Amino acid sequence: MKEKITVLIADDNKDFSQTLAGYLEKQEDMEVIGMAKDGAEAVEMIANTIPDIALIDIIMPHLDGIGVLEKIGKLNLPKRPTCIMLSAVGQDKITQRAILLGAEYYVVKP
């Protein structure tokens, strides 16, 4: 059996996180291994679980998504997760900064 793609969701909107997790769990090849409610928790969970994919909201308490990218960039991880940024706003300046810090994709939330 093929290994599942592990996903960590970092978003302070609990309803959105649960809806997204529910959708991802229905995919045969994906497994949600954690849901962080703020940026500090996201960094800790990424360091401890090293997911294949990290879905990171830009606007979160304690540490925003840009801060999460900065912190995980400084961690000595054996493998950096593919980071996909989520945001309700699509500002070019923020998008460019996220990509510069290693985000692979930037998705504007509905």
State where each predicted segment sits.
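Conserved sequence signature across two-component system core domains
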Residues: 10-11, 36, 54
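Two-component/phosphorelay signaling modules centered on CheY-like receiver
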Residues: 14-34
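Acidic catalytic/metal-coordinating carboxylates
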Residues: 38-41, 64-70
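Conserved phosphotransfer cores of two-component systems
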Residues: 47-49, 73-80, 101
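Active-site beta3 strand of CheY-like receiver
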Residues: 49-55
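Receiver (REC) domain active-site loop signature in two-component systems and cognate sites
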Residues: 60
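Alpha4 helix (beta4-alpha4-beta5 surface) of REC/receiver domains from two-component response regulators
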Residues: 67, 90-107
